[in-house]
């Protein structure tokens, strides 16, 4: 799997993400980006390629993961302000205990959020239903910080 990031630099997140995808795809395959379609559940995918991708953007950055396996990626600016009351709606009881004990609860909530979004993108289901039914850890190795953002990447 390869991951790339860039600043938006006047582009929309969509434009920057697609440019990253095209650059990664060309670097890996030597080919132009194949046609992209959206599944009935809303997940973008290539029409005729064995490669998979996931794109995320924040107000300042775009990120793209390209893999031979199904992949889901999400990112949030690490300094983003987030309503801590959201924890009651999206965290499982196990996650809530970790959140309550965290030194930096905003960062903890953003970490759980990107994990849940990355998992939703991986499955292609989105966050429909009950995000508080999943259990993640603040120590999850699929979370990293890159370019001032908290990033979660999951791969099947």
Regions found by a protein language model. Name each.
Residues 1-156:
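Core catalytic alpha/beta fold that binds nucleotide/phospho-ligands
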